Amino acid sequence: MVNPLYQKHIISINDLSREDLELTLRVAASLKAKPQPELLKHKVIASCFFEASTRTRLSFETAMHRLGASVVGFADSNNTSLGKKGETLADTISVISQYVDAIVMRHPQEGASRLATEFSGGIPVLNAGDGANQHPTQTLLDLFTIQETQGRLNNINIAMVGDLKYGRTVHSLTQALAKFEGNRFYFIAPDALAMPDYILSMLKEKNIAYSLHNSIDEVVGELDILYMTRVQKERLDPSEYINIKSQFVLRAADLHSARPNLKVLHPLPRVDEITIDVDATPYAYYFQQAGNGIYARQALLALVLNRELVL
């Protein structure tokens, strides 16, 4: 049977059904347990990063190499015809699609990856982040990590902390977890960076429980997952930032009433919002979370590029 993700563009987490998510996570677990170094042996994948990236680019390219694919591309668009000679994004994608079997793309402009699908000639485009819009593979690795640490994706108590207004990771993760039963959300953010109304409306429509809070202390004893994010200094007045920054910092002492199964996650990079002493606690899992990006991205590449995937 042809797998449902074969030759599919992956631009938004909403492009994936619950069944698609579960399939991808099963494949990720299989690839983590049993590497397949020749699965994409005869494939060529373009890694096109039009803006800076550390974790996403390196984990995607590691995923490609570990599956046996050949990798071409760039990490600085200023050294391409688009950056040097004024070539349009449409023309750049039209040309790249002549050379490769799939395109992994990050771009600072919202909607750029969706636009790329119109000019890729049917070559699948995988969104590695487009501005503040979508970052579906981050959501996949977050889901994989939650399932790995909790053994399930339903009946999860999850708190999201920090910049919930502009942080694309928390929007996508909330939308993805809303596909599973019994999850409860705790949103901890200043009013200026609160979760957008469209996310709250979606949860209300689905009759999914959520609550708004002012501090981590209020809920830490109820949580399975504590998902920290960086408060973005550039979004706030300096005086407001100083106040908010100190309010939303996680220290090891804050975890004294945590459940034994709690895991602290963060999409990284962190700045000051998780102190170093948390790293040594059994709750810290953000570096392992970053490592899981390899397996989540391997799974997506394997599914998109294999008509009938047998592992």
Curated annotation (Swiss-Prot):
Please name the pathway: Pyrimidine metabolism; UMP biosynthesis via de novo pathway; (S)-dihydroorotate from bicarbonate: step 2/3
GO CC: one term?
cytosol
UniProt: L-aspartate binding residues: 85, 168, 230
> Short name of one Pfam family for this protein?
OTCace
Which reaction is recorded as catalysed by this protein? carbamoyl phosphate + L-aspartate = N-carbamoyl-L-aspartate + phosphate + H(+)
List keywords of the entry alphabetically. Pyrimidine biosynthesis, Transferase
Known EC number(s)?
2.1.3.2
Report which superkingdom the organism of origin falls in: Bacteria
- The residues the record assigns to binding carbamoyl phosphate are 55-56, 106, 135, 138, 268-269
The cross-references to SUPFAM superfamilies, in alphabetical order and at most eight, read: Aspartate/ornithine carbamoyltransferase
Q: Which GO terms describe its molecular function?
A: amino acid binding; aspartate carbamoyltransferase activity
Query: InterPro entries from the xrefs?
Result: Asp/Orn_carbamoyltranf_P-bd, Asp/Orn_carbamoylTrfase, Asp/Orn_carbamoylTrfase_sf, Asp_carbamoyltransf, Asp_carbamoyltransf_Asp/Orn-bd
List GO BP terms, alphabetically: 'de novo' pyrimidine nucleobase biosynthetic process; 'de novo' UMP biosynthetic process; amino acid metabolic process
Subunit annotation: Heterododecamer (2C3:3R2) of six catalytic PyrB chains organized as two trimers (C3), and six regulatory PyrI chains organized as three dimers (R2).
What functional role does this protein have? Answer: Catalyzes the condensation of carbamoyl phosphate and aspartate to form carbamoyl aspartate and inorganic phosphate, the committed step in the de novo pyrimidine nucleotide biosynthesis pathway.
Q: Which NCBIfam families match?
A: asp_carb_tr, PRK00856.1
Name the record gives this protein: Aspartate carbamoyltransferase catalytic subunit
